[in-house]
């Protein structure tokens, strides 16, 4: 490098991001491990990171010395004839004096590795890193211990509170026959204009989808229920008692799931109630999705099966119903159990539920679970096809939130003309009276 006149000398010609360019490998001795605590760079006084080329220095001076020696540059001091003070702030101002200070401190050119040795060392470090990662169980690379603990707790809660075989779902009401148990409410047989309007809306809510039910007995017998043809409206109410029993059974499992989670138990009881009232239906649908067979349009709940009846408009007509579209779209993502339970946690810890007091605490918990879900996906689904999976899941949760609001309004309209909700349903959905 040529020495320029004082007035035109540009130090940037020699220095290239000296404070961010690290030599490969680690120093043999960490500066913080020295007796007496953190050490300072013998060249410029900055915080040292260890011994580099025989001297305790910072990363900046280490990189500077290595580059200067490799370039074999001829430098002259443009200021004070070789007497510049080298500090953290002035080390870039005079390269000649900085190099002199490096040599006077004891830095040795012969300790600089050749380019070939550097590449060999880098390859060795990468190989050891790959070997170290390969010894870890699948699914834990990149996850912190706290995140692994959170997933374990959620999986444990799910296992303890979700009866995937529905073997404990007993003593439920089956759909009634047309002659008993499903007559049109008396108030609607000669309705007023207001009652007729309510009835038409309920009819629209319920008639968009028909569901058949199959029950397999322990003795091998099979009981089938198929929704009857339109018979003046009374057939609409036949499934309500059974669905109320199934919903109540699922809601109890959701409540117990939340109680297993330590972060949930730490919240005030008022916030626990508010979160459960807001999220129980959403968590219930996430669990139902795990037993949904998208190929047959059937929820396989142990001995019970619920199958969608093809409407006149065919399969595409079903997808116009937001709830059904949600189940098909979510099932298409082919989620892991861990991803399902993390979705449940994100839904449960929603800080904007009505009545929540500790918004910040709940918001932080939701963020932790969301970050854990993102990390889990990055660790377990590195394929390009899954690079948008986290965003898709969060979009599904947003859609589920909207469906929850619609469902609550539907339920209240039905309850208003034909009370069917169980006490637990009334508590969760804020239904007063019967």
From Swiss-Prot:
One of its GO terms (biological process) is xenobiotic metabolic process. One of its GO terms (cellular component) is nucleus. SMART domains: HOLI (SM00430), ZnF_C4 (SM00399). Pfam families: Hormone_recep (PF00104), zf-C4 (PF00105). Residues 146-433 form the NR LBD domain. Residues 38-107 bind DNA. PROSITE patterns: NR_LBD, NUCLEAR_REC_DBD_1, NUCLEAR_REC_DBD_2. This is Nuclear receptor subfamily 1 group I member 2. It comes from Macaca mulatta (Rhesus macaque). The lineage of its organism: Eukaryota, Metazoa, Chordata, Craniata, Vertebrata.
